C-alpha cells in the first residue's frame, strides 16, 4: 500500500491513500514530536463511581471494556451525528513495548440516546461509541510521572464541567493494563481511554472546549476545540 503526502489536521496526521476511494485513510496522533498510528483504542466504561451514579447505573462486577477503531480518531468536535452527541473527558494512556509510554487527555463522544436503547436491549455499545470522529485527543507526552497522581479538567465556555483524579478510578491505570493483558494484546501505539468522571453532557454548537491533563497542579497537555 502506498500513501500520498501526509496532511496535518490539528494534532492529527492523516495519510490519504494513493487510490482515492479504494484504500482507507489511516489516522495518527502526536506523541511528543512524533506522529504515531494507533491500531486500536481500548476504552474503559463505568470507571468512576460518581459517573455511574449520574447515569443511574450500577457498579459493574467486572471491568467494562469496549473498542474504538483507528477510524474513530478525529480532530473536529461535532455536536450532532445522526443524533445529539455528548462529551466524556478521559485520561488517556499510550502503549509502547508493553508499557505505558505516554499520557494525554481525550474526548469520548457518545450518541447517548442510542446508547440507552442498546443498553436496554442488552446489546454492545459500539454503534453509539465507535463511529467516525468519536475520539479526540491532545498531544501525548512521556509518562514520566506517577500515573495515579494524574487528573483531568474539562472547561466549556470558561466553566469547569468535569474534573477527575486517577485516585478516584475503580480501576487504576496499572490495574487496567494488567486486566487488559489477560485477554488482549496491546500493540505499540494503542491508546487506552480510562473512563470519564461525573459531569458529562451534550455538546452545543459554538461551545469552546478545553481539556487539560494535570499532574501536581502542572498542566502536562491540553487540547482546544470549538464545536460545530
Where are these regions (language model features)?
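Catalytic-core "active-site belt" of small-molecule-metabolizing enzymes
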Residues: 4-191, 199-228
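Glycine-rich anion-binding loop/nest that anchors nucleotide
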Residues: 195
Amino acid at each position: 500500500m502506498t500513501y500520498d503526502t501526509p496532511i496535518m489536521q490539528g494534532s492529527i496526521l492523516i495519510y490519504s491513500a494513493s487510490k482515492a476511494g479504494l484504500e482507507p485513510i489511516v489516522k495518527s496522533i502526536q506523541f511528543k514530536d512524533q506522529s504515531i498510528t494507533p491500531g486500536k483504542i481500548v476504552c474503559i466504561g463505568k470507571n468512576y463511581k460518581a459517573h455511574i451514579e449520574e447515569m443511574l447505573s450500577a457498579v459493574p462486577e467486572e471491568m467494562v471494556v469496549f473498542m474504538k477503531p483507528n477510524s474513530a480518531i478525529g480532530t473536529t468536535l461535532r455536536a450532532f451525528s445522526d443524533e445529539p452527541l455528548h462529551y466524556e473527558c478521559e485520561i488517556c494512556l499510550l502503549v509502547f513495548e508493553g508499557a505505558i509510554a505516554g499520557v494525554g487527555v481525550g474526548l469520548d463522544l457518545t450518541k447517548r440516546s442510542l446508547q440507552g436503547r442498546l443498553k436496554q436491549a442488552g446489546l454492545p455499545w459500539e454503534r453509539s461509541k465507535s463511529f467516525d470522529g468519536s475520539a479526540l485527543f491532545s498531544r501525548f507526552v512521556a509518562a514520566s510521572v506517577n500515573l495515579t497522581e494524574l487528573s483531568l479538567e474539562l472547561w466549556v465556555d470558561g466553566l469547569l464541567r468535569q474534573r477527575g483524579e486517577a485516585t478516584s478510578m475503580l480501576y487504576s491505570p496499572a490495574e487496567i493494563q494488567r486486566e487488559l493483558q489477560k485477554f488482549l494484546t496491546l500493540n505499540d501505539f494503542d491508546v487506552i481511554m480510562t473512563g470519564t468522571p461525573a459531569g458529562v453532557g451534550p455538546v452545543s454548537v459554538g461551545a469552546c472546549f478545553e481539556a487539560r491533563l494535570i499532574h501536581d497542579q502542572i498542566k502536562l497537555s491540553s487540547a482546544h476545540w470549538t464545536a460545530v
